[in-house]
Curated annotation (Swiss-Prot):
Disulphide bond pairs: none
The protein's role, per its UniProt record: Cleaves peptides in various proteins in a process that requires ATP hydrolysis. Has a chymotrypsin-like activity. Plays a major role in the degradation of misfolded proteins.
Record flagged with keyword Glycoprotein: no
Residues forming the catalytic site: S99 (nucleophile), H124
Organism name: Shouchella clausii (strain KSM-K16)
GO biological processes: protein quality control for misfolded or incompletely synthesized proteins
Protein name: ATP-dependent Clp protease proteolytic subunit 1
Length: 193
């Protein structure tokens, strides 16, 4: 089911202008990740990050996250761009940051990673399905184990937890409330409502 995208009207010196809500938020340097992380979403978010960095490399960018996660490679495309560009990135979890969305949340600039009071964070090991020849399945299994190690080390580095603790906690779905995510080091602040 496609949910219609809201439009907002804004008065300019040239008259009234209509924006879809995401374009209007982008004017205020706000990016919203509110869906599964796919290549299409990653390309859009990456383009927005690059655009905002080129227009003002000194001004913060805010990324609001309410996502179940998704593709690891698409997630890394967003994460690497966040880390590559000059502006600080404020990340805000507004509902759920699960799987790679949690990695994006923790990937924000330290001191600027936030959640709303009822937000949840979930970390787990990468998922994947395999079929085909045994040699192909072995290649895929090695790839997913490498990704898991990279993700665990990144989360450990950003949270202050040990890689072994991250590996143990993410063996299965590991849910955290906003307060628990703050104690764990995923976020720095819980925003008041």
């Amino acid at each position: 089911m496609n949910i219609p995208i809201p439009y907002v009207m804004e008065q300019t010196r040239y008259g009234e202008r209509s924006y879809d809500i995401y374009s209007r938020l982008l004017k205020d340097r706000i990016i919203f990740i509110g869906d599964e992380i796919t290549d299409t979403l990653a390309n859009s978010v990456t383009a927005q990050l690059l655009f905002l960095a080129s227009t003002d490399p000194e001004k913060d960018i805010s990324i609001y996250i309410n996502s179940p996660g998704g593709s690891v490679s698409a997630g890394f495309a967003i994460l690497d761009t966040m880390l590559y560009i000059k502006p600080d990135i404020q990340t805000i979890c507004t509902g759920m940051a699960a799987s790679f969305a949690a990695v994006l949340l923790v990937g924000g600039t330290k001191g600027k990673r936030c959640a709303l009071p009822h937000a949840e964070v979930m970390i787990h090991q990468p998922h994947g399905g395999m079929k085909g020849q045994a040699s192909d399945m072995d290649i895929y299994a090695q790839r997913i184990l490498k990704q898991r190690k990279e993700i665990n080390h990144f989360i450990a580095e950003r949270t202050g937890q040990t890689p072994d603790k991250i590996a143990t906690d993410s063996e299965r779905d590991y849910f955290m409330s906003a307060a628990e995510a703050k104690d764990y080091g995923v976020i720095d602040n819980i925003l008041p409502v």
